[in-house]
Amino acid sequence: MFDYLIVGAGFAGSVLAERLAAGAGKKVLICDKRPHIGGNAYDHYNDSGILVHKYGPHIFHTNSREVFEYLSRFTEWHSYQHRVLACVDGQLLPIPINLDTINKLYGLNLTSFQVEDFFQSVAEPRAQIRTSEDVVVNRVGRELYEKFFRNYTRKQWGLDPSELDASVTARVPTRTNRDQRYFTDTYQAMPLHGYTRMFENMLDHPNIKVMLNTDYNEIERVIPFREMIYTGPVDTFFDYRYGKLPYRSLEFKHETHGREVFQPAPVVNYPNEQLYTRITEFKYLTGQEHAKTSIVYEFPQAEGDPYYPVPRKENAEVYAKYKALADATPDVHFVGRLATYKYYNMDQIVAQALTTYSKIHGARRQEAVIKIGANGGGLRAGTSLPALGMTTTTIATARPLGDVSRS
């Protein structure tokens, strides 16, 4: 008998498996329909010995000390600050838009104060910010919106920015300085030996059993368990009772080239007529040294594995119906991007999983106290319980993982 069946071995499922096993002493079975752990963050060494991300670039960044220290139990880190260029008008320009972007695009020599005035002069103020188009046009005007955002967003989401919630483009800042970092989070780093090795360390516990190439529907009636943690698509769980929730998918084209460097930045965006949205060169991300280099093209599409919930009002309304079903389903916990139909970053999923663990473990401990009290022992009614949850004030030393380079 397992205490928990966890569906999905990505961040949400793996964090909860580790916490329940190591933190609460529970027996956990975690399954995944794919042939590997790690979810979309899975990485591996290709035939040339280069570490690549199978499902596109995954850049770790967070402002949460708790999340960073928790993951540091399972990996050492390679310091990395992400940078992106956009191919616009035949030039490779920094994105998010900053002072250098404007000066190079228009052949100007503005200062930080002057570029702020420039943005104000081209901005088209919107009385209400409802859509992704509103966000950008209100901030930097129509021309920059057309050059950097419109086509990229249409390719990525299959919809015009005027049809998408403001949240999509609100994630991308506009800067008046020369800061070319894509993120400004306190903690920016990549797992030194890759994400997969980190997940292996996370799931390396005697209370955890992993089953791959396994659909949970095939085992839930034959393997006994007490509760389920589900990280897959919520509409699938309920057999599409209210219809299928739309997700965007991706197709990846991986290539290896016989030269050390392919492009001048880790990622180059193509907000124009190319079918792909961006090209990523992995050695920038991993810090690996190799005579060859590997890249990946990303082609957004409507069908395929679900990657991104589509942020539109009508979709949120359908999800609300599924959430009501989820809340009313006993002994099943819905966690992660697909199960809660939200566009989470990796650190946000880890934080959600840690919070879920605290709630589960706290509730179980409180139930145990009540049972003890009912038997004449333990705390008396009305006695306050200490705060329950996980503290990670110390970074535990990761196990030695060997040499990162397999070239």
Model-flagged regions — what are they?
Residues A12-G13, I37:
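Hydrophobic/small residue at the entry helix of a nucleotide-binding pocket
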Residues D89-E227, T231, F238:
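Active-site/ligand-binding neighborhood in enzyme catalytic cores
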Residues M1-A12:
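Beta1/beta-strand and adjacent pyrophosphate-binding region of the FAD-binding site
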